[in-house]
Amino acid sequence: MDYFLKNLKWLINALALEPKLLHTLLPPHSYIPNEMTDQYEMIVDEDLSDIAPVLTAEQIEHFKPLHNYINSLFVREDLIDCWYDNDFIYSSEWNVIHTMAKDFEQYMGWEISEPLKPLYSEIIYVDSEDE
């Protein structure tokens, strides 16, 4: 499976998970909203050029509402600190992301493979006090 398609599927499946399950995908003490949006920005380029080759034009059209919504949140100054607050995944804004991701997931026929594999396969602590 193509790198971008595989990672897009993981990302959509992750965003479609119930918020309490997002903690299982990332290392302890991670800023979940920030990590998820960093992944989003790496996989889905602003102009959709990275995923355009792996999705049909119709699939892109179904993806655009989610993409536009996420981008609208990125530019909101009142949310600038929310990306570093894990409570944000329980907000109404995140619920819209969750719902739209579930809708796109269903449209694509992607099943959530629970448990979804963690984002990182290994965590290396550089501070000996962390475990």
Task: Name each model feature, range by range.
Residues T37, I124-E131:
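Eukaryote-specific, cytoplasm-facing alpha-helical/coiled-coil scaffolding segments in long proteins
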